[in-house]
């Protein structure tokens, strides 16, 4: 079966994150809107959550020290999107270098809210990307409801990834 590659999924999520970076640069007040997505108090915390999850999973996949979530709370929007870009590149580095045994191997790790989990690196990689897609979609809906419409279509079909 031929399907979407991990590289193509990463390209899509990175492109979407770049759109969000550019959009928040034009709409900085939107970062401070109160909201309750994923138990967060405002949009900035949701963005932090999206970035932190991707970054911490990339660090796990690469056997790097895991950044403490609390260290990220004071980051500006620019700093958060810089970290998002770096973590996407870290995920790409893992994907390019990984062999089948790497992908199928498991990691056991603590989470902030769900206890200790064990998952294959393949599952962790996919989760790191789909977690962001899910929360960006929630955020897009919330922001539109607050009068902050985005200026690009979010659907994969409109992306520049694959024909």
Predicted regions and their residues:
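Short, contiguous alpha-helical
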Residues: 7-24, 29-72, 112-163
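A mid-sequence interfacial segment
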Residues: 91-127
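N-terminal beta-strand motif that seeds the catalytic metal site of vicinal oxygen chelate
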Residues: 1-2, 8
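Helix-adjacent hinge/juxtasegments
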Residues: 63-103
